Amino acid sequence: MSQSPYDGSPEGALVHQGFYNAWIEAAGEVVAEVARLSAQFPVYAVACVGHSLGAALAVHCTADLRQRGIEAVAYTYGQPRVGNDIFSAWYESVDPGSLRVTAYGDIVPHVPPQALDYRFQPTELFLNATGALVVCDASGEDPTCSNGVPVSELDQDAHTQGYFDVVFGACYLA
């Protein structure tokens, strides 16, 4: 899993190249539209929200907007790790209000692995095995939250069905 430098971040800050390339592909249109709407409706807050790959893109979106002077915050669900520890520390300083929601058993917050020099940014809110919402420690990798779920308990269903009774990626006919 290739990592690349993130524009505007400190020396040594690296991000997952695939997630970053996906953001760069969309950034021009997204940033232009958000800038237009922010100017038109200056009292409204900007929130970049996403699940799974969309969560990784929400992190990039928020960092990009904030570097351009647009106040934004990220709210993510089932987010994969986006960058290394230098990027994560920088991102926390850029977007201190971000919230990352994880669910017990969701496999996606375990990739890319820490062993490949990926780290989460705080703050994690963890839906534990009983469905209770736990505020995790400020490390981004709290062993009593998602990071502590045994590998044998990880599955795809928790990723698509484990968040507030919302089923992601499904369409239903009435």
Map each language-model feature to its residues.
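A conserved cap/lid and substrate-binding interface adjacent to the catalytic center
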Residues: 1-49, 66-73, 95-96, 172-174
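Short, flexible coil/linker elements and helix-boundary hinge sites characteristic
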Residues: 5, 16, 41-42, 131, ...
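Generic hydrophobic, helix-prone segments enriched in Leu/Val/Ile
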Residues: 19, 38, 91, 145, ...
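Generic structural signal of hydrophobic/aromatic residues within well-ordered alpha-helices
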Residues: 26, 30, 34, 87, ...
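Gly/Ala-rich beta-loop-alpha elbow adjacent to hydrolase catalytic centers
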Residues: 50-54, 58
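Active-site signature of alpha/beta-hydrolase-fold catalytic machinery across serine-
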Residues: 60-64
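The feature captures the conserved acid-bearing segment of alpha/beta-hydrolase catalytic domains
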Residues: 67, 71-152
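C-terminal helix/juxtamembrane-tail motif
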Residues: 142-174
